[in-house]
Amino acid sequence: NDSMRFRKNIERIGEIMAYELSKTLDYKNIDVQTPLGIKHTTTIAEPVVLCSILRAGLALHQGFMSFFDNAENGFVSAYRHHYDNDDKFEILVEYQAAPSFEGKNLILIDPMLATGQSLVAVLHKLHLEQKPKEIHIAVVIATPEGIEYLEKNVPSNCHLWVAALDEKLNEHNYIVPGLGDAGDLAYGIKL
């Protein structure tokens, strides 16, 4: 397992996704004073908030930060809590540290979209009182089942960005062929 190489590759994917996503945002005209004159240019109209699912989303988040260098940042922990060696699980969202995203572009970052339940649970936790202008969900690998679940359970101002679409979920709700636990691959196996 080469954790650094995995992180760097996920980070690169984040940079590419951030660039492509940036083309869909609204821009406004600004004037920038240079030593020799004024340059008329554009900048993103509404601020960007990057919000990552801990810990798996950190490398992808870093790629987005390289592109959206003025973005505010938020972090949420979400994980599957399995019951007694059963395939049944619930999504627990326990930690949240995020700035206000009222009227801003919220980019929710998680490398894996398996069932979609984690992302929906995080959106419900974040979205209770504040209304972002647009919500963008950025994932590296998704399944058709996860995409379908999101389409049925997210607000209409939500846009999904996927780098690769895998075949399906298996009977344990893991991505097939997938790549394993993104957090473990990036940062080492957890207890």
Give residue spans per PLM region.
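PRPP-associated nucleotide enzymes
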Residues: 1-191
